[in-house]
């Protein structure tokens, strides 16, 4: 049985005083194996190599697939499949971020290579990427963010709400930096910009904003409570940094702009 991944469909409706429609066409569909529950893939990320070739990074049941979407966008090809933990979570939660030529993978499963997998993407396109390290200070995680300073903020399933690792100093072998557990009530998703962290606090039904300029003295700047108690899913700033866009993982909830 196949699960169809429609990874290049984006439906955008821009609501301005003069509405504009951005129409995109479907280029291709990629198939991945799944189980009988019809849960097949999780996160999608992207990477561009030194020659300008673009790749889609897709989480699936048994690990991570890297697809070449530049050579033939109408027929993407898999250039690498990276095995990962696959036990204990039938939704296959995996999350991805890149820093330079390295890919960092966290997941909620258990099994071989449990922890944050570090993949060297620099061999592309001439040869396959290789796993070079497993950061085992965090075993299971739902979400990962890496800032411009090379700090990886990792949602920690067991223990601290957020675990911080230094990937900037040694991208192929991250080291422990700090933890962030005193203020945020919960962490489903984290996003940072300019030393400010925006944390989607899940079942706490709120978004927390924190000053992280001093990791030894993190302070709360604001808390945004969600009307109607929606599950706080994620948050992202606009380019100007003047508005925060949030979503809730609750049926019939709306995208909100603050």
Would you name each region that the model predicts?
Residues 2-10:
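Sec-dependent signal peptide recognition
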Residues 18-258:
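Feature marking well-ordered beta-strand scaffolds used for ligand recognition
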Residues 13-17:
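Sec/Tat signal peptide C-region and signal peptidase I cleavage site
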